[in-house]
């Protein structure tokens, strides 16, 4: 993706710091971020709300639909998708103006950091989820491919929208449901305009190496022995010190 032509990009962020809430003597501060952008040459945009780093909802631009991160949120609040579409239209118009003023100068590409981990401790034969965490990148354009034993996987995959960071970079999560096995290894391959070639992170099952019972017993016995030796040596040194002091006191008394 690094060979793609110049990208012209503009982000529109509205950040609101909520009034401090006091509970007894505790001061609490929360942040709501409305993040939206329109991207060229992809001709697509995103509109979402973030609360303390977690997505509340985003708007599916193509379907003109509000998608809540948790269904329960829709029971307590509502958001008209048309409002987001109107904002994206304004962003597009502003972007056209900025392109002319900047002489089509592209924004800088910031390559992502990628980490792969499991959602919970892994046990063989028990379903789990792999998480591919893509962080600190810009612009918000990534291609992500899951691979099992080197072959692409398309079932059981999901992802979040692009999530804003305080430094105006982005982060994103991709998920893969899987059944842990000693025969399989998994890769999360990430392609971004800031990378010269796709970045691949590998995950494979690692068995926990436990000491055999006999070795554990030997280690415990050795530790106990060393501890007892230390105690005995300490007592001997103390007794010698007391004895030496008594001899000195007797000599001084005789004088």
Curated annotation (Swiss-Prot):
From the UniProt entry, list the residue stretches annotated as the region Alpha-2.
110-203
Give the way it sits in the membrane. Answer: Single-pass type I membrane protein
Q: Which cysteines are joined by disulfide bonds?
A: 132-188
Q: Which residues lie on this side of the membrane: Cytoplasmic?
A: 243-255
Q: What is its main location?
A: membrane
What domain of life is recorded for the organism?
Eukaryota
Where it sits in the cell: the answer is: Membrane
Q: Which GO terms describe its biological process?
A: antigen processing and presentation of exogenous peptide antigen via MHC class II; immunoglobulin mediated immune response; positive regulation of immune response
In this chain the Ig-like C1-type domain maps to 112-204
Chain intervals for the UniProt region annotation (Connecting peptide): 204-216
User: Which segments sit on the Extracellular face?
Assistant: 26-216
User: What's a GO cellular component annotated to this UniProt protein?
Assistant: plasma membrane
Q: Which residues are glycosylated?
A: 143
This protein's UniProt keywords = Adaptive immunity, Disulfide bond, Glycoprotein, Immunity, Membrane, MHC II, Signal, Transmembrane, Transmembrane helix
Q: Which residues form the signal peptide?
A: 1-25
Read off the InterPro entries from this record: Ig-like_dom, Ig-like_dom_sf, Ig-like_fold, Ig/MHC_CS, Ig_C1-set, MHC/Immunoglobulin, MHC_I/II-like_Ag-recog, MHC_II_a/b_N
The UniProt entry, under PANTHER family, shows:
HLA CLASS II HISTOCOMPATIBILITY ANTIGEN, DR ALPHA CHAIN, MHC CLASS II-RELATED
Q: Which family does it belong to?
A: Belongs to the MHC class II family.
Q: What is the name of the protein in this document?
A: H-2 class II histocompatibility antigen, E-D alpha chain
- Organism of origin: Mus musculus (Mouse)
Q: Which gene encodes it?
A: H2-Ea
């Amino acid at each position: 993706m690094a060979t793609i032509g110049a990208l012209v990009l503009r982000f529109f962020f509205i950040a609101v710091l909520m009034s401090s809430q006091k509970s007894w003597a505790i001061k609490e501060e929360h942040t709501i971020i409305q993040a939206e952008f329109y991207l060229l040459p992809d001709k697509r945009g995103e509109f979402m709300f973030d609360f303390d780093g977690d997505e509340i909802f985003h708007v599916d631009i193509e379907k003109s639909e509000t998608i809540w991160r948790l269904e329960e949120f829709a029971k307590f609040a509502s958001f008209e998708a048309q409002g987001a579409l109107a904002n994206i239209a304004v962003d597009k118009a502003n972007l056209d103006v900025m392109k002319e003023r900047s002489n089509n100068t592209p924004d800088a590409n910031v390559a992502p950091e990628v980490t792969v981990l499991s959602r919970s401790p892994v046990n063989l034969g028990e379903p789990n989820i792999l998480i591919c965490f893509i962080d600190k990148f810009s612009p918000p354009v990534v291609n992500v491919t899951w691979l099992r034993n080197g072959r692409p996987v398309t079932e059981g995959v999901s992802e979040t929208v692009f999530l804003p960071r305080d430094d105006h970079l982005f982060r994103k999560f991709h998920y893969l449901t899987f059944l842990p096995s000693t025969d399989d290894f998994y890769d999360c391959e990430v392609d971004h305009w800031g990378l010269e070639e796709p970045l691949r992170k590998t995950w494979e099952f690692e068995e926990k190496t436990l000491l055999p019972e006999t070795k554990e017993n030997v280690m415990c016995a050795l530790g106990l022995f060393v501890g007892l030796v230390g105690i005995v040596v300490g007592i001997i040194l103390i007794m010698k010190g007391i004895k030496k002091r008594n001899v000195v006191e007797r000599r001084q008394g005789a004088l």
